[in-house]
Design a protein with these regions (language model features):
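Active-site-proximal polar cores
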Residues: 1-30
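Short, conserved turn/kink motifs that form compact alpha/beta structural patches or helix kinks used as
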Residues: 21-109
Length: 109
């Protein structure tokens, strides 16, 4: 598997605003990343009448198909679609065999 195709744009239906963490507790200037995918993770509470906050999940950013893509540092704040803003807990770089980045997976809360 020497080459892996980019994630098709038809699957990347969301746009995302990013306030990158500056590493000192603040944020750098806002950046737009178009064509990302947000997959929400629903969690159930012990109370059978309600569910937990739906603002958790994963964001997939393709290195080729996502316009403005970059490696988003943990601690950054993101706004995807009409969801509330979320904080990036981790950013996993997914590479092809030759070491180039195929996509990033962000865990957001």
């Amino acid at each position: 598997m020497r080459y892996l195709r980019p994630i098709p744009k038809r699957l990347l239906t969301d746009d995302m605003l990013v306030w990158p963490s500056d590493g000192e507790g603040g944020f750098d200037a806002v950046r737009m990343v178009r064509h990302v995918r947000f997959e929400r993770e629903e969690q159930l509470c012990g109370d059978a009448h309600r569910s937990a906050d739906g603002g958790h999940g994963r964001v997939f950013v393709d290195a080729v198909s996502s316009a403005g893509a970059f490696e988003i540092p943990a601690g950054s704040r993101v706004l995807v679609g009409d969801n509330p803003s979320m904080v990036v807990e981790s950013c996993k770089r997914c590479c092809v065999i030759r070491g180039s980045v195929h996509h990033w997976e962000l865990v957001v809360r």
